[in-house]
């Protein structure tokens, strides 16, 4: 039976001396995972900007003047072309994100074709499209969608200070519909929104206490974008971010904890501590929707320095070839390792 976490228990973990917390997180990580393996994914923005939501951190909101040029939903073949290049570079999972409050019914046939096309290549599929109805979740599942990303962002108590156009319960409801449809769940949050340590603990309690914890838990560091209300937020202390990764690993021992947005602004040493704390998934060689990710050669060098190996997805078709291709690129410094799906 899964552990039911209390807020006080989560806060106690955050208050644990740093090195003791790291030791506990690493022990748990090694019990459930190979500590040298990191799951790698490619992310593509299939519809950018003009989002009606008011998330204060997001440059894709139509409410803020960030200089982001809005783009319509990409053509199916254009998306599949990007997926082919990602697979050729060794990616095991292809994630597609759209700046919507929710997908329109007129878009569903195109989204289904994207999922089907990527699946036919032997890759895992993931989408993040906003809120879903039960029927939409079922249609995506029928098309073969493996993962659906829908973040909770922060604690229920702090959430209203960040977003007013979508309720916390609506996010939880979407996760429930996704799970009910048989799609794996990807859900996490953001550090650096102005939240307290108690809010970080509250977020992780919400995630860990879902009927089934998410298979993937992305922990993002706020990327401050000029024009958004959070452009001048205080920087996140690297130790506080690493601590959040460690607590997530302890509270959700079987989940993949993803080091996600904000990696561009992290030093190699901070990223290394995140991996030590239990992070075992990244987006690589891509632009995270509208914010930068480390250059491909930087990812290559860091993997080699730390002795980390890419872990392919669980899709049966083509997995061995994908793993071998990426592993070969990791070992060859004169090869372009990572495909930038946002170019």
Swiss-Prot record:
GO terms for biological process: biotin biosynthetic process. The keyword Transmembrane helix does not apply. Its EC number is 2.8.1.6. SMART domains: BATS (SM00876), Elp3 (SM00729). GO terms for molecular function: 2 iron, 2 sulfur cluster binding; 4 iron, 4 sulfur cluster binding; biotin synthase activity; iron ion binding. Binds 1 [4Fe-4S] cluster. The cluster is coordinated with 3 cysteines and an exchangeable S-adenosyl-L-methionine. Binds 1 [2Fe-2S] cluster. The cluster is coordinated with 3 cysteines and 1 arginine. Its cofactor is [4Fe-4S] cluster; [2Fe-2S] cluster. This is Biotin synthase. It comes from Erwinia tasmaniensis (strain DSM 17950 / CFBP 7177 / CIP 109463 / NCPPB 4357 / Et1/99). The lineage of its organism: Bacteria, Pseudomonadati, Pseudomonadota, Gammaproteobacteria, Enterobacterales. The gene is bioB.
């Amino acid at each position: 039976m899964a552990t039911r976490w209390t807020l006080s228990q989560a806060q106690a973990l955050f208050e644990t001396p740093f090195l003791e917390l790291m030791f506990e997180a690493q022990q748990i990580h090694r019990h459930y995972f190979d500590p040298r393996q990191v799951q790698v994914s490619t992310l593509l923005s299939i519809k950018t900007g003009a989002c009606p939501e008011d998330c204060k951190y997001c440059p894709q909101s139509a409410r803020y003047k960030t200089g982001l040029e809005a783009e319509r939903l990409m053509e199916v073949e254009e998306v599949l072309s990007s997926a082919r290049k990602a697979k050729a570079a060794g990616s095991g999972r292809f994630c597609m994100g759209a700046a919507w409050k929710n997908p329109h019914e007129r878009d569903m046939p195109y989204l289904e074709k994207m999922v089907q096309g990527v699946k036919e290549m032997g890759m895992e599929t993931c989408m993040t499209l906003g809120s879903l109805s039960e029927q939409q979740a079922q249609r995506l599942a029928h098309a073969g969608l493996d993962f659906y990303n829908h973040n909770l962002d922060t604690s229920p108590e702090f959430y209203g200070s960040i977003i007013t156009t979508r309720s916390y319960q609506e996010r939880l409801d979407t996760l429930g519909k996704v799970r009910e449809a048989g799609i794996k769940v990807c859900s996490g949050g953001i550090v650096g929104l102005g939240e307290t340590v108690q809010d970080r603990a509250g977020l992780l309690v919400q995630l860990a206490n879902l009927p089934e914890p998410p298979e993937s838990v992305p922990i993002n560091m706020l990327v401050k974008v000029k024009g958004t209300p959070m452009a001048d937020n205080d920087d996140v202390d690297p130790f506080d971010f690493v601590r959040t990764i460690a607590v997530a690993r302890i509270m959700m021992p079987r989940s993949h904890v993803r080091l996600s947005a904000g990696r561009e602004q992290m030093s190699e040493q901070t990223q290394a501590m995140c991996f030590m704390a239990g992070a075992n998934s990244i987006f690589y060689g891509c632009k995270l929707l509208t914010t930068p990710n480390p250059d491909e050669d930087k990812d290559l060098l860091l993997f080699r320095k730390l002795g980390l190996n890419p872990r392919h997805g669980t899709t049966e078709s083509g997995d061995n070839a994908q793993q071998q291709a990426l592993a070969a690129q990791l070992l060859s410094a004169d090869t372009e390792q990572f495909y930038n799906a946002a170019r």
